[in-house]
Amino acid sequence: MPRRTDLKSVLVIGSGPIVIGQAAEFDYSGTQACRVLRAEGLRVILVNSNPATIMTDPEMADATYVEPITPAVVEAIIAKERPDAVLATLGGQTALNTAIALYENGVLEKYGTELIGADVEAIKLGEDRQLFKGVVERCGAESARSHLCHSMEEVLAGAADLGYPVVVRPSFTMGGLGSGFAYDEADLRRIAGQGLHHSPVTEVLLEESILGWKEYELELMRDRADNVVVVCSIENFDPMGVHTGDSITVAPAMTLTDREYQRMRDIGIAVIREVGVDTGGCNIQFAVNPEDGRIIVIEMNPRVSRSSALASKATGFPIAKIAARLAVGYTLDEIPNDITSSTPASFEPTLDYVVVKVPRFAFEKFPAADPTLTTTMKSVGEAMALGRNFTEALQKALRSTEKRGATFSWAGEPGDRADLLRRAAQPTDERIGLVMQAIRAGATPEELFESTRIDPWFLDQMFLLDEIAGEVRDSDELTPELLRHAKRHGFSDAQIGELRHLPEDVVRGVRHALGIRPVYKTVDTCAAEFAASTPYHYSSYDEEDETRPREKAAIVILGSGPNRIGQGVEFDYSCVHASFALRDAGYETVMVNCNPETVSTDYDTSDRLYFEPLTLEDVLEVVHAEMRCGPVAGVIVQLGGQTPLGLAAKLEQAGVPIIGTSPQAIDLAEERGAFGQVLERAGLVAPKHGTASSFPGAKAIAAGIGYPVLVRPSYVLGGRGMQIVYDEASLEEYMRTATEVSPERPVLVDRFLDDAIEIDVDALFDGEEMYLGGIMEHIEEAGIHSGDSACVIPPPTLGNAELARVRAATEAIARGVGVRGLLNVQFALAADVLYVLEANPRASRTVPFVSKATGVALAKAAARLMAGTSIRDLRAEGLLPGRGDGGLLPADSPVSVKEAVLPFARFRTAEGVVVDSLLGPEMRSTGEVMGIDVDFPTAFGKSQTAAYGGLPTAGTAFISVADRDKRAMIFPIKRLADLGFTLVATEGTAQVLRRNGITSTVVRKHSEGTSEDGELTIVGRIGAGEIAMVVNTPSGNQARADGYEIRAAATAVGSPIITTIQELSAAVQAIEAAIVQERNGGGVNVASLQEHTARLNAAWEGRA
């Protein structure tokens, strides 16, 4: 069946900001869909609030709306654009829930718009727990015994029938949000209460516990002619009880018997047919009881999911691309396989290698959070590796996570066997390491299985690794056979060096002298049965190399590895742009990365893709392989964040050509003393600072500067380990618990600028001329990490004279450091002094936002500058505007606001309360959104709607502010009262309001408890949903504790919470704008990026 001719335009709904459970994989799937649909000649309209995505680039769709993904906004877009169809299966749970809401409130019918990809009935059958249970039974399969509940009374009755422990699973949520295992009634009340709150239909399913069973997933696709393919089987290394996104997973499944696998396939195919997914993909999860082989169907996602992205990268079978084609009418046998070019998509992929995915966590950012892994997903990213066997893939994947202590180590004593077995029984992110240490301590396979319920086959592979490590350590000499044997099982040069007490580079020298190097195999979807036309490679210590020679010069781009807090999809965005720009300029582009979620690891983003860990050893081998294939013009390290930057100096020492800013210049900007001299020569000032490698040193510096001070380790990204310290006792505590402090790695002590305006600048420099990308003003004051602060382009309160000072200072720094490419500088403006906080000669996390706000692709331009072009040439080519730059935008240009999205609701302490939502100098956001409109209040309002679901326009606001903020709060709070809000406040705050003629009611503090006549405390009232908005600025440590309870309650019920006065002023402006809009009867204003850019260009022309 060829493509439907009745469809002319399609609205694709994206997934919004990156949050835990819904990450970059949806940018990857959405980007693929937009490309395919446009190639089919359809007009593509896209809505997505996340500016850090490739899919929101103006060239990916005909109309790109960077707007909040809410039913009201999407309705406004449908009313304006009148698409024939809506495709919602590629934007995760956000897109699905929005599409269902539009269907149910009649919007789709009103505008004659069809839902394609999966119909509402199929979505409901797959997502509604009770209906899905019926589907499974009709297919002759089993699901776990369960009860569907809509209230706490039903929950308690259900648990009484099933017996503890029970699993709680809310309907229509994502990444296991609100789910968990309840071992007793207290657990059940807490978890089910959360689940009922997070489920949009207030519904949870209670299930019998299948803890300890084996967990599998199948990724399937079906078309309207009823062809079904099983793309991939995936097995979880951890047994049931850990969310699949937090588990180490392996493809293909390793421990199934053929009969079990066939049974699972049969069930999967029956289920996808019964649910009625007939134009796309789905993912089905199974549990298998290891005692008797009983198979239970756990759940299904009738859409593209995190596992689909993994399955796509693992097999080379592009699920999202094919799903988009099926949605517009094609069948599987009509769609060609891109990789082989000679087989159709109805051929099931075959794997002749093993794929392992390892999650990456961020518990160090939330020290109070409980690190136990449960059914609520907590990982923030993942790394994937391919190998010829399980052990090779596993060891490569572990070192790809770039986490200290993630790889197996055989150094030192393993510890007590009984203690290790006890600790390994609890699933945490360190469990696999504990298993290896228990093996070293003499634990038997039976004891380990009893403790962890990890399948004996996987445990046996771990024993094999321990045996090989023993051979390497104990043999008289490192023979070529032994070295090759260890490398075939994934041992790195560093691990072999540790076992032999040799430095890593000596091991590498020996290995190269013996001619032992990896070969590169190809992912071809068909186990080499047909030739592959796309070079998608992985390394292995095998015999035959499959890389091909080439004539053109290549540029190697090092990606950013697994997503983590502080280094997210924004850096991947810059790498992808560089690949596109350099390919257009006539180079062959080579991408090295190990993150399966991203666009950079799509096989058609660059000319060659190496799915490899970003370690010195692996990168050197890739560069060597590419130099064998043809000329290499250089390697780009400044786009992938801190990971590739950290390799720059060592790569250069090894003779690898680094293009762009030199490693020496990178060091110059990072090293305080040298950078201080650059500033001095330019006549610029930094806040007073010093470096210390001991507490007495730090104490002396702090005394000289005066408290508060900002302390942090050198060389970090995302403010890791930073703290604002108010007194000497806290400083001593920090120095005692900080990361390893040594003369090589000193701690930096800075003056902390209270009440300063923070300014962020992204610029390009070619050695002669500077192009200012954009000047952003932060809404929160300095001291909150720039990645967590909201920021605005053009800056709303800076005058032309200040902007001119910022421009001159940025250019002086670019010249002084010797930048070629991108530069990010952070300034603080305090008492009319412009302080330089830091300069980073690399792509920053604001590059995508600035590019979207100003309509200029900065990362593309930067890649060309690194390859030797000048800014003048790029202006002539049209890659940069012919005149002017982002530092002086026209007066009537649209205002863009970037807001950070924080994951506090996911993390709980061991007692089950949420971790504190206070912001500070350590970055904790996982993603971002953008609001864009004609003025600041409306744009800020949109950013809040996109990030947290919006600000209220009526109701009760609770106010409790620190003494230092009491003067500044009066005007915004008075405005709130004038707008009709009811105010409640703590006693001290209420008194100040009363003196200024503002009426408020005093509420009971949390520490006072509920009164005898039943008056709730503020925490109780927030929990009961009586408070529409919380304003709570913290002061000192004691008040922080009372404030913590208030903020935790607000986080738990999803009330907007404001913790700084600057944010309060912005919020009040946004609320007023929304009320005015409502009064005037106006709906939501929506405009596409293409329209904004056209307006901006017209304004530039008008200036000329």
UniProtKB/Swiss-Prot annotation:
Binding site for Mg(2+) 2: 299, 301
Cofactor mode of binding and number, as noted: Binds 4 Mg(2+) or Mn(2+) ions per subunit.
Positions bound to Mn(2+) 3: 826, 838
Chain sites annotated for binding Mn(2+) 4: 838, 840
Pathway(s) of this molecule: Amino-acid biosynthesis; L-arginine biosynthesis; carbamoyl phosphate from bicarbonate: step 1/1; Pyrimidine metabolism; UMP biosynthesis via de novo pathway; (S)-dihydroorotate from bicarbonate: step 1/3
Annotated segments matching region Carbamoyl phosphate synthetic domain: 548-948
Keyword Zinc: no
GO molecular function, one term: carbamoyl-phosphate synthase (ammonia) activity
Protein name according to UniProt: Carbamoyl phosphate synthase large chain
Native organism taxonomy: Bacteria, Bacillati, Actinomycetota, Actinomycetes, Kineosporiales
Function text: Large subunit of the glutamine-dependent carbamoyl phosphate synthetase (CPSase). CPSase catalyzes the formation of carbamoyl phosphate from the ammonia moiety of glutamine, carbonate, and phosphate donated by ATP, constituting the first step of 2 biosynthetic pathways, one leading to arginine and/or urea and the other to pyrimidine nucleotides.
Assembly with partners or alone: Composed of two chains; the small (or glutamine) chain promotes the hydrolysis of glutamine to ammonia, which is used by the large (or ammonia) chain to synthesize carbamoyl phosphate. Tetramer of heterodimers (alpha,beta)4.
The protein's enzyme class: ligase
Notes concerning its domains: The large subunit is composed of 2 ATP-grasp domains that are involved in binding the 2 ATP molecules needed for carbamoyl phosphate synthesis. The N-terminal ATP-grasp domain (referred to as the carboxyphosphate synthetic component) catalyzes the ATP-dependent phosphorylation of hydrogencarbonate to carboxyphosphate and the subsequent nucleophilic attack by ammonia to form a carbamate intermediate.
Pfam families: CPSase_L_D2 (PF02786), CPSase_L_D3 (PF02787), MGS (PF02142)
Catalytic activity: hydrogencarbonate + L-glutamine + 2 ATP + H2O = carbamoyl phosphate + L-glutamate + 2 ADP + phosphate + 2 H(+)
